[in-house]
């Protein structure tokens, strides 16, 4: 989906430094940004924020971070955070390749990758969020028993991700080849997921972990 540029979005986000990190001010000290010291879950590529804001509302005992590089959609997440008065959700406006600039080693308990850009052309494979260079970043910031939760409607990206994670030495704790056939009451829909499901698209989901170091 092409995002329409909104020239005012950056200034709007900058008006809320208590909620949005635009310039790396909290890099390396994310835990201090929250009111309480709690486990941290992050979503990379939050879009308009339906998933992450629903999670933060449902689980106040968890701290959440929304990471989104598009300022022109991130303002929608900010609006939801303000509307719901969420104190356990902060936002980073940056690219996933900068993850280790923000988070310390072993600081994160869970990473969500929901409907990431599949980058279907082979020459763009390194941009996929399950490419091995990104997996190395995730391994660095995740706790030893940390998890990656992944959802997509793109069969090619799902197959690529299974292979990439397996080759990296990860293992899978859950695999769903048609998520909505299983009527999972705990599943929280993203904006894309709702749209794709209504069209009858198959939703693929997995949960994965890194093997513990010996």
Swiss-Prot record:
Any one Gene Ontology cellular component term annotated for this protein: tRNA methyltransferase complex
Ligand binding (S-adenosyl-L-methionine): 43, 68, 95, 117
Keywords for this protein: Methyltransferase, S-adenosyl-L-methionine, Transferase, tRNA processing
Record pathway: tRNA modification; N(7)-methylguanine-tRNA biosynthesis
Active site, renumbered: 117
Database matches in InterPro entries: SAM-dependent_MTases_sf (IPR029063), tRNA_(Gua-N-7)_MeTrfase_Trmb (IPR003358), tRNA_methyltr_TrmB_bact (IPR055361)
EC number: 2.1.1.33
Binding residues for substrate: 121, 153, 190-193
Enzymatic reactions: guanosine(46) in tRNA + S-adenosyl-L-methionine = N(7)-methylguanosine(46) in tRNA + S-adenosyl-L-homocysteine
Molecular function GO labels: tRNA (guanine(46)-N7)-methyltransferase activity
Entry function: Catalyzes the formation of N(7)-methylguanine at position 46 (m7G46) in tRNA.
Family label: Belongs to the class I-like SAM-binding methyltransferase superfamily. TrmB family.
Protein known as: tRNA (guanine-N(7)-)-methyltransferase
Gene name of the encoded protein: trmB
């Amino acid at each position: 989906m092409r995002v329409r540029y909104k020239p005012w979005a950056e200034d709007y986000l900058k008006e809320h430094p208590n909620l949005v990190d635009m310039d790396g001010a909290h890099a390396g000290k994310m835990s201090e940004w929250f009111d309480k010291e709690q486990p941290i879950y992050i979503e990379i590529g939050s879009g308009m924020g339906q998933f992450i804001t629903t999670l933060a509302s449902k689980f106040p005992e968890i701290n959440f971070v929304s990471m989104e590089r598009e300022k022109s959609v991130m303002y929608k997440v900010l609006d939801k955070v303000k509307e719901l008065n969420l104190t356990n959700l902060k936002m980073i406006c940056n690219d996933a390749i900068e993850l280790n600039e923000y988070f310390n080693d072993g600081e994160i308990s869970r990473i969500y990758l929901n409907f990431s850009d599949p980058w279907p052309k082979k020459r763009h494979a390194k941009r996929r969020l399950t490419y091995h260079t990104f997996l190395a970043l995730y391994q660095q910031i995740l706790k030893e028993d940390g998890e990656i939760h992944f959802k997509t409607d793109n069969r090619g990206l799902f197959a690529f991700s299974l292979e990439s994670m397996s080759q990296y030495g990860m293992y899978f704790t859950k695999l769903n080849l048609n998520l909505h056939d299983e009527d999972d009451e705990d599943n929280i829909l993203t904006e894309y997921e709702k749209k794709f499901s209504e069209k009858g698209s198959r939703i693929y989901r997995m949960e994965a972990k890194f093997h513990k170091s010996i």
